Amino acid sequence: PVDDVIKEMLETQGWDAHEHAYISEYVKLFLRAMRKFMHTEALIIPNEDLDLVDATYLTYQSMGGALRLTVGCRMTGNVLLAMAGRFSGEEETEVNEMAIDSIEELANVINGLYIVNMSGHSHDMDLDMPKTLENGVPAGEDVFALRVETEFGAFMLYLSREGFMLNEKNLFGW
């Protein structure tokens, strides 16, 4: 069903069949990573935005080379802390440098696995450094979003071929 959901979403935005395959592969890898690193099942819900009432955080990373893809997760502070804690194995109680480092390392691991998989299909790719900013909302012509539901809360997964248009003035930097 993931392939069908992705195909339908991408067709409405004019992406071609080749792009369906590599985006679908990313989403499936992301869901497997949720099981492995977050110890939870994740359900994707297409075309349904998530009203994130409290301050939100966006962690994103761009991949370049043979294929270009930028991915990001937009989440509440509580979801960020839950993900960072599950990944690091330590209890995270506040959004600070340690929590941000954990969530960015999770992005590095997931996206690193993806580019290794893509190299197996003769698509050499590289990773930019992950970034996290407060109150960031990805924008751009080809950005599409999936709502991800987990036992520790919901968040948005954004994907784009061309990158996100963002105001990075709220970028965390330690």
Sequence positions of predicted segments:
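N-terminal auxiliary interaction/assembly segments of multi-subunit proteins
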Residues: 1-174
